[in-house]
Amino acid sequence: YEEPANLLKQELREPAIYNAIIKAIAEGASRMNDIKLKVGEEYSVVSKYLKTLIALGIVKKETPITEKPGKKTIYLLADHFFRFWYRFVPANSSAIDSGRIAKTYPYAVKKHLSGYMGLVFEKMCQDYLFYYADDLPVELNEIGQWWGTDSNKKRQIQIDLVGAPAEGKDYIIGSCKYKNEKIGMDELELLREYASVFGKGSRYYYYIFSKAGFT
């Protein structure tokens, strides 16, 4: 079960630093400064190793859709196998080695799956829209996340799904919720607030995806 770690040992020098970077991202560090602090290396070192991981397709760099790369850039694990492994396996290696993982799974893994599955579910929702692109009210150019600052309420916001048009200013704004609770009208109202902060469209079409359904 140690294939990801063994792969790094075979392919890369100093695998410990690569392991530390991947583990930091898997545990939620997405900005360069956060990754640097978790890894304990200088900016130049982390940046160099990140470039290699990006070239290998293990890590990807993302910027809010419709914006140029800059301070808002974040780093995510592009390979979901690596993402799952580094999120759950090292922390539970003792249980795996001793054959206790079936007993520890409910609280060591299962209770955290909704949080882990969030990004996976978002990708599924993006793929769904692309698959049914001919039926959408907007001719899509690209789909991605958007995040930024709501200056009126002094808060950071994130829109799970933004469909940018090939031309014009009609946008799709979406929410993707992988939770056990049903979603109500308050989620639509929140999306409308977020769309006004996004502010790049003249018309918005709202799509809400929910694992548990709707109230």
Stretches found by the model and what they are:
Residues T73-T215:
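A cross-kingdom feature that marks ATP-driven nucleic-acid transaction machinery
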